[in-house]
Amino acid sequence: MFKLFTARQHDKIWDFDGGIHPPEMKLQSSTVPMRIAPLPDQLIIPLQQHLGPEGELRVRAGEQVLKGQPLTVGRGRTVPVHAPTSGMITAIAPHTTAHPSGLAELCVHITPDGEDRWREQQPWADYRQRDKMALLDRIHQAGIAGLGGAGFPTASKLQGGLNGIITLIINAAECEPYITADDRLMQEHADEVITGIHILRHLLQPQQVLIGIEDNKPEAIAALQRALRGQDDIHLRVVPTKYPSGGAKQLTKILTGKEVPFGKHSSSIGVLMQNVGTVVAIKRAVIDDEPLIERVVTLTGDALSSPGNFWARIGTPVLYLLKLAGFKPQNPPMVIMGGPLMGFTLPSLDVPIVKISNCILAPAETEMGLSEPEQSCIRCGLCVDACPAGLLPQQLYWFSRGEEHEKARNHNLFDCIECGACAYVCPSNIPLVQYYRQEKAEIRALDQESARAAEAKARFEAKQARLAREKLARELRHKQAAVKLTDADQQTVDAAVSRLTRQSDGSESVINIPAGQMPDNSAVIAAREARKAQARARQAEKQQARSTEETTDIVDPRQAAVAAAIARVKAKKAAQVQHVTTDVAEAGSEAIAEDPRKAAVAAAIARVKAKKAAQVQHVTTDVAEAGSEAMAEDPRKAAVAAAIARVKAKKAAQAINPD
């Protein structure tokens, strides 16, 4: 009885609040075997196909590549992309990608050569001989991201779960209508699914491994049971069909009874989840050394004559796949990537298949129902009952329309999984998920702006602090420089301190002079005489330097010639003055001999002439001095001064001897 109770507890499943039961519409594609899509004429590989930044390019246009060759560098959370086949890189240019915005992203354009040649491969037959970090690096370099739709880098997710993981859950629910990619993958490749689970179990060492699958996939359930025969370490749990039971938080609640707290991931409660398609990709990367270059894509809808699931290379244009399934264009044209609840209408059919593209839905004109206009909310509360995350969709709608961002955030807008259950049950046809997506984008933009502003403020404050530190350091250096002593000053101070220390210690005795005796000042007198001798020597050196400079000043030949001319003029004038004085004296003597009165007159005239001669001599001396100064300044000025002196001397001579 106890064993039966334990078994029932072991297989127990729980339920989550909310959820809906839309038409499944899976039989169109789940009953048809998978097909391999041929290579298209051109492959378009976007550089970013995961959550995180795009990788750095490793190739150039015009380069030949091989199948499986990496096109970008994978570092950190950057997942590399690989060449899906061998061929020529014709261009590296922007192209419209699978996104609701329809914006162009950088892509690598490859023209296949038809040979499909692989790069060198290194399979690992026994992965258990490899350490965990080598396995994680292998998974990362294979470019594996979550194939269930989130696109989170798988290696990063696994590395975060190396410690503390209690339960490993394999998500095989595939709850959204129309999509059957995982269903067919489990039916045809159940052995690879189980092998991939063993690799994850070797990495994470969880206490239990659970596979959650909805009860509307009997063929897949049977295939997994056959693959698990004889293995009791992996438990298959069949859960009731209910949308969105494939959500990470919802499936965790169903299988473990635990709820993931608001704002956190399932790893916070010891649970790690991986999609079935991701598990197969891990097996092929680790054991077969095959990077993620293809995936299973469901092509379904009434606009297709041959729906089914295809192995499609990453980068295959959507229109090419639709033609393989017998696409019949509708009016108005509408092709959805993803399911009818969580998918989005493609802006163009030239967009390529990426790693998270699990379904291409091409409905007929009447298949999705007539489009009805949006009406006002009637506050019926059906959206609250349908929400599997336990949110208040009606309140979030009002906050989103009113741009009340903080209120929307506080009401846990980011816990919305965008499943579309609220919009599905809304009688007013309000596209609630679109409002939530737009509000999330606006809040993220505001957060980024706030982060940039905070970074700018932090940089400004850091700069101000640095400038303040530099100013203080500068002032300190100036203070230190102001009080810093030279070596000589320091020696003097040290000597004085030493003398004071010796005196205080008594080591230096004071000299006492007895009364009636004179102190011996011979040393002081000798020092004074030495200083005087040094002063006299310096004075003699200065005089010698001045005489040398004067001698050097007369070295110029032109200056010497001018000086000689001035000397001759002075000598000539002196001779003339002497001759005039002699004549006057003789005339006076003759006049005295003849008449005393005439003698007096002659004497007066002689005195006047002598006075004029003295004035002429004084002028000549001034002119000579001026000429000497001009000569010292400029040779040309000296010549002019000499000419002027000669003219003045001539006039003076004429004044003395008018006759």
Swiss-Prot record:
Residues annotated for [4Fe-4S] cluster 2 binding in this entry: 387, 416, 419, 422
InterPro entries assigned: 4Fe4S_Fe-S-bd, 4Fe4S_Fe_S_CS, Ion_transpt_RnfC/RsxC, Nuo51_FMN-bd, Nuo51_FMN-bd_sf, RnfC_N, Soluble_ligand-bd
Instruction: Please provide the record's keywords in A-Z order.
Output: 4Fe-4S, Cell inner membrane, Cell membrane, Electron transport, Iron, Iron-sulfur, Membrane, Metal-binding, Repeat, Translocase, Transport
- Residue ranges of domain 4Fe-4S ferredoxin-type in the record: 366-397, 407-436
Q: What's a GO biological-process term for it?
A: electron transport chain
This protein's cofactor list reads:
[4Fe-4S] cluster
Report the GO terms under cellular component: plasma membrane
Nucleotide-binding found in the keyword field: no
Could you tell me the EC number(s) of this protein? 7.-.-.-
Q: Where does [4Fe-4S] cluster 1 bind?
A: 377, 380, 383, 426
Q: Where in the cell is it found?
A: Cell inner membrane
GO terms for MF: 4 iron, 4 sulfur cluster binding; electron transfer activity; metal ion binding
Q: Give membrane topology per the record.
A: Peripheral membrane protein
Cross-referenced Gene3D superfamilies:
3.30.70.20, NADH-ubiquinone oxidoreductase 51kDa subunit
Q: Which Pfam families match?
A: Complex1_51K (PF01512), Fer4_7 (PF12838), RnfC_N (PF13375), SLBB (PF10531)
Q: Please share the entry's free-text remark on the cofactor.
A: Binds 2 [4Fe-4S] clusters per subunit.
Functional summary from the UniProt entry: Part of a membrane-bound complex that couples electron transfer with translocation of ions across the membrane.
Which family is this protein grouped under? Belongs to the 4Fe4S bacterial-type ferredoxin family. RnfC subfamily.
Q: How does it assemble?
A: The complex is composed of six subunits: RnfA, RnfB, RnfC, RnfD, RnfE and RnfG.
Name of the protein: Ion-translocating oxidoreductase complex subunit C
Q: Which organism is it from?
A: Yersinia pseudotuberculosis serotype IB (strain PB1/+)
